Curated annotation (Swiss-Prot):
EC number: 2.5.1.122
Enzymatic reactions: L-tyrosine + dimethylallyl diphosphate = 4-O-dimethylallyl-L-tyrosine + diphosphate
Subunit record text: Homodimer.
Catalytic EC class: transferase
Xref: Pfam families: Trp_DMAT (PF11991)
Keywords from the UniProt entry: Transferase, Virulence
Top-level taxon in the UniProt lineage: Eukaryota
Gene Ontology BP, a term: alkaloid metabolic process
Classification lineage: Eukaryota, Fungi, Dikarya, Ascomycota, Pezizomycotina
Protein name: 4-O-dimethylallyl-L-tyrosine synthase
Family per record: Belongs to the tryptophan dimethylallyltransferase family.
GO MF term list: transferase activity, transferring alkyl or aryl (other than methyl) groups
Induction: Expression is co-regulated with the other genes from the sirodesmin cluster and corresponds with sirodesmin production.
Pathway: Mycotoxin biosynthesis
């Protein structure tokens, strides 16, 4: 296996001549440039992904205070395990080759994020990918099934016996399908993704999370997604325990009642888990709702709740909602945002449940990708929010940092760099995360 060979030999790799960057792009890439002198890229696909995406990841870590040892460790992890899983490089004209990933709206198979926490000093870097095989989308691998298993199995040496795939296997069986089961049904170029994986780059070792999209399984089995998810949770009852199941059934009951009376029916899109011992894992149910008023957001966040939402957190959320979407202060809470006819329009939520509690932790993903003015206005709005809460470093550096990391275009030239600004309701307040599409296929990256 390629990843295993890389793991065994990474410290002895010979130096390679990587495409030179302009001096202005080199000035802040110290750890990446240092590694770049010694790492050998196995083919042009991994060369593209390393030179295009790894500098972004390195700068994101550097700008929020990761020391050089941590940066090096995580970049080596990215090089060894992740690069071979990003699929083929784009065509010379800058188009996907063989597989359109649902990870981002432009099909980039990678999403980067800064988790800012609730207060100063709580920030960390995360990223998510769709593992894509070399032959994904072809007759040899039409559903892109192979690479996710190669990646997950190959990660074992890096996780020092903490990797547990019990839940991965259960949810994979319950929520995804195979080429053999799907048969000759016609597939569109879009909507084929079934697996994402994500990594939290903590101080210690990265943490692995897996995500399952049941859309194809629903078609193959002629079963609504909601029923598939209920069956998957029931199959895990022995692993998750009674408290978890109480919370899930409460959430599911509330969703069904809301769907019966709502003009917009909430739709389950993704189920996520942590790849650790089931008793330490979480299940996260991702739901998209087409309602976009702030009142609708509050109603959705209350799904399955045993108590009302914290008033102070709701007030903070409304402030952030207005700042990043560029709404006036007097924008009515019951007014919908302008209609956007897109597959990912509306508002995305997740509901987190743990085996050790019957509590449900809600999270909202503010859909700035579709409803804000441009990426500069989003960045300025988020910086203002940070400033008002004493997160001085983030407030002062956020806009310039984005311009530095994503230098292929100006922030005020359009939307798409920010995918979401998310908020999790925690006991100490709102925990904010900003998510980014690296815009792998942006035309500016391919102009001579």
């Amino acid at each position: 296996m390629q990843t295993a060979r890389l793991f065994q030999g990474n410290l002895n790799l010979a130096a390679a001549n990587i495409r030179d960057y302009e001096k202005k792009e080199q000035r802040n890439l110290g750890v990446w440039l240092s590694l770049n002198q010694w790492l050998r890229l196995y083919d042009e696909d991994t060369r593209f992904w390393w030179t295009t995406t790894a500098p972004m990841l390195g700068r994101m870590m550097e700008l929020i205070g990761y020391d050089q040892d941590a940066q090096q460790k995580h970049l080596l992890f990215y090089y060894i395990y992740v690069l071979p899983s990003l699929g083929r490089r784009p065509s010379p004209e800058g188009y996907p080759t063989g597989w359109n990933s649902f990870m981002t709206d432009d099909y980039s198979p990678l999403e980067l994020s800064w988790d800012w926490g609730v207060a100063e000093g709580e920030s960390s870097v995360r990223f998510s990918i769709e593992p894509i095989g070399k032959y994904a989308g072809t007759q040899a691998d039409p559903l892109n099934q192979k690479m996710v298993y190669q990646l997950v199995d190959g990660l074992r040496p890096a996780f020092h016996h903490t990797l547990d795939l019990t839940l991965f296997d259960v949810f994979s069986e319950a929520l995804t399908t195979s080429r053999e089961k799907f048969g000759t049904r016609k597939l569109s170029l879009e909507g084929r993704s079934q697996y994402f994986v994500a990594f939290d780059l903590d101080v210690g070792h990265p943490r692995l999370k897996a995500y399952f999209m049941p859309g194809l399984k629903s078609i193959e089995s002629n079963t609504p997604v909601s029923e598939l998810v209920v069956k998957a949770m029931d199959a895990c009852e022995l692993h998750f325990g009674s408290l978890f199941m109480q919370a899930f059934r409460r959430l599911n009951s509330d969703l069904e009642a809301f769907s019966a009376t709502s003009y917009h029916r909430p739709e389950i899109e993704i189920v996520g888990i942590d790849c650790v011992s089931p008793v330490k894992s979480r299940a996260k149910i991702y739901i998209r709702h087409r309602g976009t008023s702030f009142d609708s957001v509050c109603r959705m966040l209350s799904m399955g709740a045993k108590a009302p939402l914290d008033a102070a957190s709701v007030a903070s959320l409304r402030e952030l909602w207005a700042l990043v979407l560029g709404l006036p202060k007097d924008f009515p809470s019951d007014q919908e945002l302008p209609s956007v006819p897109h597959r990912t329009s509306g508002v995305l939520y997740y509901f987190e449940i743990k085996p050790t509690s019957d509590a449900i932790v809600p999270k909202v993903y503010i859909p700035v990708r579709h409803y804000a003015s441009n990426d500069l206005s989003i960045a300025q709005g988020l910086a203002t929010y940070f400033e008002r809460r004493g997160q001085t470093v983030a407030a002062e550096n956020y806009v310039d940092a984005l311009s530095d990391i994503f230098s292929h275009r100006s922030l005020d030239s359009g939307l798409g760099l920010h995918t979401y600004i998310s908020c999790t309701f925690k006991k100490t307040g709102l925990s904010v995360t900003s998510y980014f599409n690296p815009e792998i296929y942006h035309p500016n990256r391919y102009r001579q």
